[in-house]
Amino acid sequence: MVGGIRNPVLSEEIPGHPGVRLLTLHSPALRRRGDVTLYLPAAAGDRPLPLLILLHGVYGSHWNWWALGNLPGIAREMLAAGEIVPFAVAMPSDGLWSDGSGYVTHKGFDAESWIVDDVPACVRELFPQVETQKVFLAGLSMGGFGALRIGAKHASRVAGISAHSAVTRLADLRGFVQDSIAEDLAEERSDARILYWMRQNRLRLPPIRFDCGTEDSLLAGNRELHASLLRARIPHEYAEHPGGHDWAYWQQHVRTTLRFVSQIASGAAAR
């Protein structure tokens, strides 16, 4: 039992999917079970492994980046080509609150603490070679919002932040969900704003990068966030690429996230 995490259940490696395992654990933050898809590269052996926590979007779950995004296959390919160093990837569910939790706190349900506390603690307990003192956060769409906001809020615990096609305000979820969740999540409180936390923790922020497709309905919000960060003189990288809000775009550009993690992890290891 780790910090209230009881009886984690870990699968064997999934046949035909090297390095992929499925994990279910009791989460104190969620007050229920939570699911995680894990990828640990075979080439790592017992060497210390940085941890990337990769978040999904609305209507999704922990298996999305594996089954729809081919994340483990892309990572294996890049590792074999020498493009990245080995690191672990945890792909958790958002807690499965309604159509999407926004990775924020609801009544009796703390999706934020699930991501920054419970997931790293359980992964570390099961795989002691995984380093969790500082983790990398990344995600797509709603998961991009989660990575940017949680990463900025918990800046001292995060080594790098990357987002693809990010929701930049919770109100933007109205364009994706069909029930009252958007209204519930879209309270204009400062705690829910990316820019609020980036300003609050500007001197402690890790490296930040994000991108968006030029045919994505969220492009305007990403441009606005980029402009706001420039005005606030908060260092970051922003890019636009041809493409929409779909898996074709995310499969292509998650490679940038993997390189980003590898470069930072390599620099940290060299110090």
Walk through the language-model features, giving the residues of each.
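Non-catalytic cap/lid and distal C-terminal segments of serine-dependent acyl enzymes
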Residues: 1-271
